[in-house]
A protein has these predicted regions:
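Short glycine/serine/threonine-rich phosphate/pyrophosphate-binding segments
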Residues: 3-5, 78-84, 116-117
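ATP/NTP phosphate-donor binding region
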Residues: 1-64
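Accessory alpha-helical/coil subdomains and C-terminal extensions
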Residues: 17-28, 144-211
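Short Gly/Thr/Asp-enriched flexible loops that form oxyanion-binding sites at enzyme active sites
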Residues: 73-95
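Glycine-rich beta-strand-to-loop/alpha-helix junction loops that act as flexible
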Residues: 1, 75-76, 100
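Structural motif
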Residues: 69-70
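Internal gly/pro-rich beta-alpha loop/helix module
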Residues: 100-174
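Catalytic cores of soluble, metal-dependent hydrolases
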Residues: 65, 211-212
Length: 212
């Protein structure tokens, strides 16, 4: 997003197109042959079932191509963990899929987005990232989708995995993994959205004297 002040934390989400994001980090061209595609341009607070379904199908379509070795998804932080978890269940490939975002607007004095994007591309391009499920690359850490939690609304170190710890980290343009998840994901998941046009709706009823 973009903000009115270089030192403030307020911003308007969904304002920067994918082309501008890539142009802001020319160093990624030294890592991989990166092509940008704009799926949607919304604030992540407006994510919904249909966007998730469209995104999962598009990713599965792209990952079938032999010339694509991995995918990076730029995403707002409000619903990044939900999107990561959904894709972890519905992507049917062992190729790396990495979500990345920023806690500070692109207009901030020390914006975190450019380095986060660089690290995400490094992660997606690394052979070591294969078959590790959907990943989140934020502030130098590599997190598994099933464990990622947003802990703070302004701190750049907000995305963490409090119950299991980070899978690894990026340092000086290289990835280092300390552990892998043993939970089923992606190709092992039983969920398949290939033939769905909409996600099933599940109603939750509330009985009279419930405090829930």
């Amino acid at each position: 997003g973009t903000g009115s002040s270089a030192t403030g934390t307020s911003y308007t989400a969904g304002q920067v197109a994918i082309g501008a994001l890539l142009d802001a980090v020319p160093e990624i061209k030294d890592i991989a042959n990166v092509t940008g595609e704009q799926i949607v341009k919304i604030g992540s607070q407006d994510m919904n079932d249909q966007v998730w379904l469209t995104l999962a199908k598009k990713i599965n379509e792209l990952l079938k191509r032999p010339d694509i070795d991995g995918i990076v998804i730029t995403h707002g932080t409000d619903t990044m963990e939900e999107t990561a978890y959904f894709l972890n269940l519905t992507v049917k490939s062992d190729k790396p899929v990495v979500l990345v975002g920023a806690m500070r607007p692109s207009t901030a004095l020390s914006a975190d987005g450019p380095l986060n994007l660089y690290n995400a591309v490094v992660t997606a391009a690394a052979k070591e990232s294969k078959d590790k499920g959907v990943l989140v690359a934020m502030n130098g850490l590599i997190l598994g989708a099933q464990s990622t939690v947003k802990m703070n609304t302004v701190d750049v170190q907000t995305f963490q995995a409090p119950n299991s710890g980070a899978l690894g980290y990026v340092l000086n343009g290289k990835v280092f993994y300390n552990q892998v998840t043993l939970k089923k994901h992606t190709t092992q998941s039983v969920f398949d959205v290939t033939h769905l046009n909409a996600l099933p709706k599940v109603g939750i009823g509330r009985y009279g004297n419930s405090d829930a």
